[in-house]
């Protein structure tokens, strides 16, 4: 079993208008040095907007994360209705093993695009759920 110490310390979700206006929604969660692999992250957005938005995920990590990429399952929901579900893969390092993202010292922040110019449905009680999609080879169970 892998140690939980390698998981990200901060998780940020942002919905930004396509026209570079201030964010429609931006929130973050701090973890005590780790994001438990069994824990879903939930962001309650509330109401939507009638303008297309960019859905982005910001992740801060350090050298304790032992992988060169990350797999996430991202869901956009309202109540029990699933509006959008994607399995996402993002590179976290370049080919030489150097961290991607911005920052100095050991902490790097990566801006990960989920959807560009996405038209949110005009409904209330929207939320975004993010969870790890890392799997051991040949297993359906998450790490």
What are the residue ranges of the model-derived segments?
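Short coil-to-beta strand junction motifs in C2/discoidin
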Residues: 66-72, 142-143
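C-terminal motif of bacterial Sec signal peptides marking the signal peptidase cleavage site
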Residues: 16-18
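Short acidic/polar inter-strand loop motif in beta-rich domains
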Residues: 62-64, 109-112, 131-140
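Post-signal-peptide N-terminal segment of Sec-exported extracytoplasmic proteins
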Residues: 41-69
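An anionic, turn-rich surface loop/hairpin at beta-sheet edges
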Residues: 88-119
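Noncatalytic modules at the cell exterior or secretory-pathway interfaces
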Residues: 50-57, 118-134
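Bacterial signal peptide processing site
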Residues: 20-23
């Amino acid at each position: 079993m892998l140690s939980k110490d390698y998981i990200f310390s901060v998780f940020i979700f942002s919905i930004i208008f396509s026209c570079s206006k201030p964010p429609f929604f931006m929130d973050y969660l701090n973890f005590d040095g780790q994001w438990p692999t069994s824990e879903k992250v939930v962001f309650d957005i509330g109401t939507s907007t009638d303008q297309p938005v960019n859905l982005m995920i910001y992740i801060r990590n350090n050298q304790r994360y032992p992988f060169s990429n990350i797999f996430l399952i991202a869901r956009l929901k309202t109540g029990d209705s699933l509006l959008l579900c994607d399995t996402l893969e993002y590179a976290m390092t370049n080919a030489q093993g150097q961290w991607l993202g911005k920052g100095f010292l050991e902490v790097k922040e990566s801006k990960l695009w989920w959807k560009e110019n996405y038209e949110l449905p005009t409904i209330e009680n929207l939320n975004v759920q993010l969870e790890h999609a890392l799997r051991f080879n040949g297993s359906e169970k998450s790490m």
